[in-house]
C-alpha cells in the first residue's frame, strides 16, 4: 500500500473543502498514510470576466489537474463531478464517485422567498445556460445576468445589491456552511440539475492500480450508477457548458429512473422526457433516452445553438 498520497485540487474554498473532505476520509481509512494537497489553478479559475459558454472547450476546471496526474505530480484529483468532461484523457480514469449530496439548485435572495415571488423584471444571476433556459421558460420576464466567481464572490454580489436573487448549487452552499442562505431548493420540474451535480469525482491514472485499489472504498454504487446514466446521456448529446441540458437520475433498489431536458437558449423550447429500467443498464438507458430526445426535436434545438 502506498504510504504517501498527493491530492490535486483547485484553489477555491469549495474545492479545498471537497479535497480536504476526501483527504480526511483517506486518513481515517489508512492511518499510516500521509495525505497532502497540491493546489493547482485551472483555466476556468483564471478567466472570470467571460461567461463559461463563451470561453469554449471542455475541461475548463479539470485540464490542468489532469496534466498534473499524467506527469506524476499528483496521485489523484478531486473534482465536482459536474465539471468533468464525459471523455477523459487517455491514461486517466474515473476511479470513484462519492455519495451524492443534494443535487438540486438553490434559490438565494435577501428579499424574496422563491422564484415565484420575484417581481416582474427582477434581476437574477447565474453562470449557467442550463439554469437560464429553464428559468426563462417558466419566467420569461426575468432579467438574467451572468454571474461568475467562487461562492463567496457570488454571494457578495447579491449582498451588494447587484441583483435580486442568484442561483447556486445547493451542495456547494451546504458544504461551505451557507445552508441558511438557501431560500428554496428549486423543484426539478422547474429546473433540472446539471449532470453529476452534488457528487464528487476521484480521478487517477489508469495504470496506478495501487492507488485505484485504495480509493475503492470511496465509491458509492447507487450514485455511480445514477451519474453513469447522466454522463452517458450528456456524452451522446455532446453537450457541455455551451448547451442547455439538464438530466437527473435516481436509483431505487435495482431500478434507475432518468429525467432530462434539452432547451433552446431563450427557453422558448424545452424538450423533456424520462426513461426507467434496470440500474445495471444505467449507461445504456442514458444513451437510449438521449437518442430518443434527439429524434423528438433535440437535434433541431442543438443545431440552432451549435
Segments from the language model and where they lie:
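Small-molecule-sensing regulatory modules
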Residues: 2-48, 54, 62, 137-306
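Short, structured active-site "lid" loops
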Residues: 50-75
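Extracytoplasmic loops/domains of multi-pass membrane proteins
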Residues: 68, 84-89
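Structured loop/turn residues at beta-strand edges in well-structured enzyme cores
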Residues: 72, 120, 161
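A conserved helix-loop-strand patch within extracytoplasmic ligand-binding domains
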Residues: 81-82, 90-142
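Short glycine-rich anion-binding loops that position phosphate/pyrophosphate groups of nucleotides
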Residues: 81-84, 171-173
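Short, Asp-centered acidic motifs that coordinate Mg2+ and/or phosphate
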Residues: 74-78, 164-165
